[in-house]
């Protein structure tokens, strides 16, 4: 058992540290070009040149980097990627022909080269606008095994340059899958790559939640025959159990703290309780009657949305964490569950069953206005979770016959599968990497 715990700890340390690649600035960014794209604007047309390289190993690195950068930028939904025209370079001096960038409809140009220094890949990238003004020039380096992370580091820098946000690069998604025959917890990169199994309970593991700082992971486990909540320190592997009599389900971490909220029933009703990371109960939060589950927090941790049956069928309510005052948020739909509070703090996602029996994902402003249906006519769509930057949503859907994970933009556009994996996947939770 000790060997298993140690292996899990080492694996998690490796996973959460993988994307932190050292890089050096080659030149400063041009400040006035930060956040040139506003939300809701059309895609930015990027002429993306192939990475140049000399030597067999460097050309191999260049091909790998090109794939990573193309896929990474395309995944965001922010860009219209254009191949570099044949006349991109001036014949005499080999410089860039900026007129050709505009001629193919490009807004900006991105390209660079990879060299080898002390056996390590060194990627030098440049970004220009169509007039030839330099927007970014940076050098990235790391081990050969970190080529994917090197390419994604550039993608993150480009997105931040143009939008002011870091986007989803470097984030991870935890979820439940049954490809082994049992429901276990898995983790993958933001784009579905590098899937790793985190639990091996050979039973049922559900509702994974990673703490806001990436230190802990909590989940519900049925190995003992009843639902127990486990909290694990990812770095050390230390694990504690919240082993209370009765129900112990649906954990959610409170931002800015090492505490989480979960549903317990050891005092009678199924209510929400504040739990410390060591597994001890700090206090009871809800006493409204009925069943209270599925908590989610505002970014500052001052308010909590949750599902309650206190007024009949399950609906979304919001509670002030200081005063304890509770108000109902949702009134449309006969069965509203699985809320997820946006990182911007202004919206809440949730799953809603309509009278037709179909389950779809909706977005609503925290004041109850602005109800927007994001999915329709494509099976049951559930378990929405915001990306840490608020630009995307991961969810589960049966549109292809079995439960699989999908992603979409925050406005519901560009819905597509996240990963190709045997069995079914559900209950995704998008998280940061420590």
From Swiss-Prot:
Q: What's the source species for this entry? A: Chlorobaculum tepidum (strain ATCC 49652 / DSM 12025 / NBRC 103806 / TLS)
Q: Which domain of life is it from?
A: Bacteria
Primary residence:
periplasm
**UniProt cross-references to SUPFAM superfamilies, sorted A to Z:** TolB, N-terminal domain, Tricorn protease N-terminal domain
Localization recorded for this chain is:
Periplasm
- Spell out the Gene3D superfamilies in the cross-references: Dipeptidylpeptidase IV, N-terminal domain (2.140.10.30), TolB, C-terminal domain (2.120.10.30), TolB, N-terminal domain (3.40.50.10070)
What UniProt keywords are attached to this protein's entry? Periplasm, Signal
Disordered as annotated region, ranges:
413-434
Report what the protein is called.
Protein TolB homolog
Q: Name one Pfam family in it.
A: PD40
| CC annotations in GO | periplasmic space
**What is the residue range of the signal peptide feature?**
1-27
> Record's PANTHER family?
PROTEIN TOLB, PROTEIN TOLB HOMOLOG
What are the GO BP annotations of this UniProt entry? protein import
Report the InterPro entries cross-referenced here: 6-blade_b-propeller_TolB-like, PD40, Tol-Pal_TolB
**Family from the record:** Belongs to the TolB family.
């Amino acid at each position: 058992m000790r060997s298993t715990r140690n292996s899990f700890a080492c694996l998690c340390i490796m996973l959460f540290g993988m994307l932190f690649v050292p890089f050096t600035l080659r030149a400063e960014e041009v400040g006035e070009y930060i956040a040139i794209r506003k939300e809701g604007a059309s895609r930015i047309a990027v002429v993306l040149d192939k990475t140049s390289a000399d030597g067999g190993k460097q050309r191999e690195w260049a091909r790998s980097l090109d794939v990573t950068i193309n896929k990474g930028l395309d995944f965001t939904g922010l860009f219209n990627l254009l191949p570099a025209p044949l006349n991109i370079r001036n014949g005499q001096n080999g410089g860039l022909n900026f007129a050709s960038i505009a001629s193919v409809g490009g807004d900006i140009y991105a390209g660079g080269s990879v060299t080898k220094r002390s056996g390590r890949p060194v990627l030098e990238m440049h970004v220009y606008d169509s007039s030839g003004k330099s927007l970014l020039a940076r050098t990235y380096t790391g081990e050969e095994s970190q080529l994917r992370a090197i390419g994604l580091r550039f993608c993150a820098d480009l997105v931040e340059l143009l939008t002011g946000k870091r986007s989803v690069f470097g984030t991870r998604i935890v979820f439940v899958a049954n490809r082994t025959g049992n429901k276990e917890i898995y983790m993958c990169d933001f784009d579905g790559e590098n899937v790793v199994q985190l639990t091996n309970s050979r039973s049922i593991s559900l509702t994974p939640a990673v703490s806001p700082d990436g230190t802990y992971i909590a989940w519900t486990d049925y190995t003992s025959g009843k639902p127990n909540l486990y909290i694990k320190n990812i770095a050390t592997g230390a694990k504690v159990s919240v082993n209370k009599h009765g129900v112990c389900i649906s954990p959610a971490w409170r931002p800015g703290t090492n505490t989480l909220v979960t549903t317990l029933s050891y005092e009678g009703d199924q209510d929400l309780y504040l739990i410390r990371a060591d597994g001890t109960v700090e206090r009871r939060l809800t006493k409204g009657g009925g069943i209270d589950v599925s908590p989610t927090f505002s970014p500052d941790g001052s308010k909590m949305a949750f599902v309650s049956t206190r007024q009949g069928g399950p609906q979304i309510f919001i509670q002030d964490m200081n005063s304890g005052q509770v108000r109902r948020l949702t009134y449309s739909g006969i069965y509203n569950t699985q809320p997820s509070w946006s990182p911007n703090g202004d919206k809440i996602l949730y799953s809603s069953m309509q009278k037709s029996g179909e389950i779809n994902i909706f977005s609503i402003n925290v004041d109850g206005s602005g109800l927007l249906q994001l999915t329709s006519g494509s099976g049951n769509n559930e378990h929405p979770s915001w990306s840490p930057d608020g630009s995307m949503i991961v969810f589960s859907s049966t549109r292809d016959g079995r439960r699989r994970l999908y992603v979409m933009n925050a406005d519901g556009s560009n819905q597509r599968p996240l990963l190709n994996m045997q069995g079914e996947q559900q209950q995704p939770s998008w998280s940061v990497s420590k």
